[in-house]
Each structure stands twice: as C-alpha cells, then as structure tokens.
Amino acid sequence: ILLAFLFCATTAFSQSSISAGLSYGSFNYDISGTKYTGDGGVLNLDGQLSPAITYSLSMSDGKFDDVVLNNSEGSITYSVFPNIGIDFMGSQIKLATVQETDTSLGISYNLYTSSFGIKVFAGSDINNYGKFYTYGTKVNLGISQGSNLTLSYKTEDRKQKATTMDARFIYDLTTNIGLNLGYKSTETKNAAGTAIVLKGNTTYAGFTYKF
C-alpha cells in the first residue's frame, strides 16, 4: 500500500525529485537457531514530492531455498513547521514463522544543513494507538563533495519488539549515477522482550540514479 501510494504521488507532482537505488543483497538470518542464508535484491527510493512532503522507502526481497524473505520500511513526512513534521511510517518483515507488520503515525524533529542532517521521530501504531510505539533517529553526514553517509536506528514496540540499525553510503560517480553500499541489521524479541526470535543482517551493493 505504501509503495503504491508513493508511486501515485510521484506521478502527481511534476516537480518531484527522486533518488532510486537498485542493489544486489546478501541475507543472513537466524530464527530460533535455524539459519537462513541467501541473496536477492534491495530497492531504495528517496525523494521530495513537494517543498513540504518527503519520503523514504527500502525494500528487500530474497530467497533461502524454498523460504522467501520480504522486508520493507517506509515513511512519508509532511512538514507543518520549519523543523517539525507529521510522519506516516510503515514496516513489514516476513520470513518463515516471523510475520510482523507495523503502521504508525507520529511526529519528527528535522534539522538539515548543507553537510549534516538529523531526524528524531516517535509515533504509535495506528491500530493500537497509545499502546505500541515506534521511535528512532536518522543522521545524514556529507563526508565530502559527492559522498554521503546515512545512519539510522529504529525500535518498534509491538507484539514482537523489533530493533533495526542501518548504515548506507552513496558515492556520486556522475551527476546522476552513484555507487550504493549498505548494511542493515534486524532483531526481534518476544512480547516480553526476554528472548530473541529473529536476528540477522542484509549487506548490499549497487547503484543509484537521480531523476
């Protein structure tokens, strides 16, 4: 649903800017002692639909023999004040016995300069508002002209508490094409937070294109 919304919205805004990344991904996960190792694809979409609306989406799809991995995260931010935004966030992970989906609504504080940016956000599950929470931060570092490092951390307090950490590096090869390197780790625990259910990581490499 989130992906469809983004594509429809992108078409609607003729002045939109988009950075699309397509990469080869290597997946390594463990569910209660059972290991899953395989490969697949990783899609990244980042852009601005209007001066007040920005979005970010990451999708991973892989296969481990006859088991399929689907992992996606996305957010849309609507700026209501210069540094304050309303955030619609969604995530999904499906692998073997683990199937978790979260849709949250919240607020964020955003501060950006030419070489540094930080976003701090917090929200609550739409279906259980005030019961389950999502919170985290995202930092953008302009290492040098034409290169950028993004670090992010997110915790989703739901039926299975999920913690995600990401590191993504983009190096511009030309005006429109860039090298895309990334690492993402995911860990989910049971409802009590006492035992790890899923733990693993995704490493990917590919290219980005700016429209």
For each predicted feature, which ranges?
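Outer-membrane beta-barrel "beta-signal"
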Residues: Y78, F169-L173, S185, L198-F211
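Residue-level signature of outer-membrane beta-barrel architecture
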Residues: G47, Y78, P82, Y109-L111, ...
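Detector for outer-membrane/organellar transmembrane beta-barrel domains
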Residues: E100-R158
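Residues that define the transmembrane beta-barrel architecture of outer-membrane proteins
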Residues: K35-G41, V68-S72, Q99-L105, Y129-Y135, ...
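Repeated loop/turn-to-beta-strand initiation elements of outer-membrane beta-barrel proteins
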Residues: S16-A20, P51-L57, P82-F88, T113-V120, ...
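Transmembrane beta-strands of outer-membrane beta-barrel pores
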Residues: Y24-D30, M59-K63, G90-A96, L111-T113, ...
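Short glycine/proline- and aromatic-enriched beta-strand/turn motifs that initiate or cap beta-hairpins
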Residues: S14-F64, A122, K210
